[in-house]
Regions:
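Residues that define the transmembrane beta-barrel architecture of outer-membrane proteins
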Residues: 1, 31-33, 103-107, 163-167, ...
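Surface-exposed extracellular loop regions of Gram-negative outer-membrane beta-barrel proteins
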Residues: 1-26, 30-36, 171-190
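Residues on the lipid-exposed face of transmembrane beta-strands in outer-membrane beta-barrel proteins
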Residues: 3-9, 37-41, 99, 109-113, ...
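Gram-negative outer-membrane beta-barrel transporters
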Residues: 10, 126-129, 141, 146-238
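Repeated loop/turn-to-beta-strand initiation elements of outer-membrane beta-barrel proteins
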Residues: 13-16, 46-49, 118-121, 179-183, ...
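Transmembrane beta-barrel strands of outer-membrane/channel proteins
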Residues: 18-22, 39, 51-55, 64, ...
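Membrane-embedded beta-barrel scaffold of Gram-negative outer-membrane proteins
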Residues: 42, 83-154
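C-terminal beta-signal and adjacent terminal beta-strands/loops
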Residues: 231-264, 277-285, 289-341
Length: 341
């Protein structure tokens, strides 16, 4: 259950928006008030400052594992209500946990600049403080029961509290003329998490991301159009294998002889959490299309395209056991047609 109130104030050069959102999470029996602020100030006719800040909350956690080299699919779970009672921050200070919600504080500041009639620049910097996050507990080695009640929560809880930060800059440059558009988008960000034991980089901590898009139109009524899109993403973190071991089962209990057993199964010995990086991702796609007016109110569109023009091997999946890599789409031509009437 949620509701919000918003008030927008417009002056000669300033737009100010104040809002208050309220969320009631029935599964946890918690209410979360979230004030937010946004503004835009026209410094000149061509240059505008803007910013926003606010409190945010959510009750969903991703059901993926850090033990996978690459996560192919993401599921989501409702946040648990049996979290630890106390959390130790990076400075060694212990604080009591009074809420089961995930909470964050966001701040954004930037500007918009109309450099010329054809060129626009948009630059934003942001910082996000994750005051409280919930994650699956990779440090669990004991059951959470009465027999283990004196053990630390970090060794027995299914889910644990984490904190973290994310900082970054987003830059967008647009160049638009009558027949062609060119877009350049660049993002830099750094994210880290503290789980009460260690600081680590989350699996989505991609330092650099870039998109270059170019579109050109020509012919009668601009019926021809071609475009290129190139995307680059720097390497994502993963937890490497440190080694392998055989799982001795001790099926005969204390009377078994482990020196003569020959187990059929092996297990992975993992290295430091997300301490390695995959290869960089980049890909070029090209497309050309022609719009044909068959008759009044009827048009046909023919598309020819190539995905991954230079056949880059981008990682899709890596097997933990064999280290075999599966790659994403190879060079892939396509042909399509649509009829609109």
């Amino acid at each position: 259950l949620a509701g919000f109130f918003s008030y927008k104030l417009k002056a000669k050069r300033t737009v100010l928006e104040l809002s208050l959102r309220g969320h009631y999470y029935a599964s946890l029996g918690e209410f979360s008030p979230e004030p937010r602020l946004g503004f835009k100030y026209n410094l000149t006719d061509d240059f505008r400052l803007k910013g926003a800040a606010g409190l945010y909350s959510q009750n969903l956690i991703a059901a993926n594992s850090d033990r996978d080299v690459v996560n192919l699919f993401y599921g989501f779970l409702s946040g648990p209500d049996n979290l630890q009672d106390f959390f130790t921050d990076e400075d060694g200070n212990s604080k009591e946990i009074t809420s089961n919600l995930q909470k964050a504080t966001h701040g954004i500041f930037g500007f918009e600049w109309d450099v010329t009639r054809y060129v626009e620049v948009n630059l934003e910097g942001y910082v996000k403080y994750f005051n409280q996050l919930v994650n699956t507990n990779r440090n669990k080695i004991f059951e959470d029961n009465v027999a283990n009640r004196d053990l630390p929560d970090v060794l027995k809880k299914d889910f644990i509290i984490e904190t973290g930060t994310a900082r970054g800059v987003d830059l967008v440059v647009k160049y638009k003329r009558k027949n062609y558009d060119i877009w350049g988008v660049y993002s830099f960000q750094k994210s880290d998490r503290w789980d009460g034991v260690q600081t680590y980089s989350p699996v989505f901590d991609r330092r650099h991301n870039m998109n270059l898009i170019a579109t050109y139109r020509w012919g009668k009524d601009n019926s021809w159009e071609t475009n290129f899109r190139w995307n680059y993403g720097s390497a994502l973190p993963f937890t490497p294998n440190q080694g392998f071991g055989q799982s001795v089962q001790f099926e005969e209990g204390i009377y078994g002889d482990y020196t003569s057993e020959n187990p059929n199964s092996i297990f992975n010995v993992l290295g430091d959490l997300n301490s390695s990086r995959l290869s960089d991702y980049h890909r070029l796609d090209w497309n050309i299309q022609k719009v044909i007016e068959v008759r009044e109110h009827q048009t046909m569109e023919i598309n020819v395209g190539v995905t991954n023009v230079y056949n880059r091997d981008n990682i899709f999946y890596i097997s933990r056991t064999t280290s075999e890599a599966v790659y994403q789409l190879p060079i892939l031509p396509s042909l399509g047609m649509s009829w609109t009437f």
